[in-house]
Amino acid sequence: MCGQIEFYVIFITYEHCSVVEFRIKIRRKEDAMSQPERILFAGDPHGNFKPLIAAVHQYHPQAVVLLGDYDLDMPLDVCLQEIADLTEVWWIAGNHDFETPVKYSNLFNSAYSDRNLHLKVTEIAGLRVVGLSGVFLGRVWYPPQKPKWLGKYHYLDSQLPNVLDADMPLKYKSAIWHDEFESLKNLRADILVSHEAPGSHRHGFKVIGELAHAMGVKTIFHGHLHENYIGIIKNNIKVCGVADAAVSDLQGNKLT
């Protein structure tokens, strides 16, 4: 949690010719964004976790957030065992994490399986962080085009009888589904972490910025496109692109 700053509002009244002073103590959270290294953001490692591990040793963050595309040949917790006791590890998934059953299992069945930020808001080091895993697929939904399927239930209903979500092809599991995306607009967060980019990038999607605005998000961090940059989109939302195997702080400063 952020540190607490205390200050007082003083009201003075007169009672029986005497001054009566009321002090009301007010607390507010210290601005977590003023401590940029409290959370680090790791761009697509593609099997190379050395820069992230080095950054944790150097900057001692409270938490790290990984932005997808791990290309895991062993469980994620094994790859990061050197920093397991040094910081919190959180993550979203990228398209590469659904390429094979092994890559998928090494992420979703790892000891960090409960640190998946997808489709929920989690308080991390005093900030509300919401995650959006996966990518837009033409066979599911590719904005600004209309979605091919309203949601997973719609897709599954079109398949053979008794086909369950667990049987969905990995390619479809990697997709951003329209109904899940829209449901996020009911949540509130400070930071959005996504694999896909918003409209700040030439290969980004305007709808991600619209989603961020609906949630009250002030900063977006994304991976996928292997570029470090800082930009501003509509509604004064800051966007920080984090390159492959790069690490950035809360201000978007490249640390590795």
Q: Model features per residue range: what roles?
A:
Residues 7, 14-85, 99, 186-188:
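N-terminal active-site segment of His-dependent metallophosphoesterases
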Residues 52-56, 76-84, 105, 181-182, ...:
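Short amphipathic alpha-helical segments and helix-helix/interface helices
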Residues 46-52, 71-75, 95-103, 121, ...:
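Active-site environment of divalent metal-dependent phosphoester hydrolases
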Residues 127-195:
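Active-site-proximal loop/helix segment associated with metal-binding centers of metalloenzymes
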Residues 101-118:
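Glycine/small-residue-rich loop that forms an oxyanion/phosphate-binding "nest" at active or ligand-binding sites
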Residues 35-36, 51-54, 122-125, 210-215, ...:
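Binuclear metal-dependent phosphoesterase catalytic core
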Residues 41-43, 64-69, 89-96, 117, ...:
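Active-site neighborhood of phospho(di)ester-bond hydrolases with catalytic His/Asp-centered motifs
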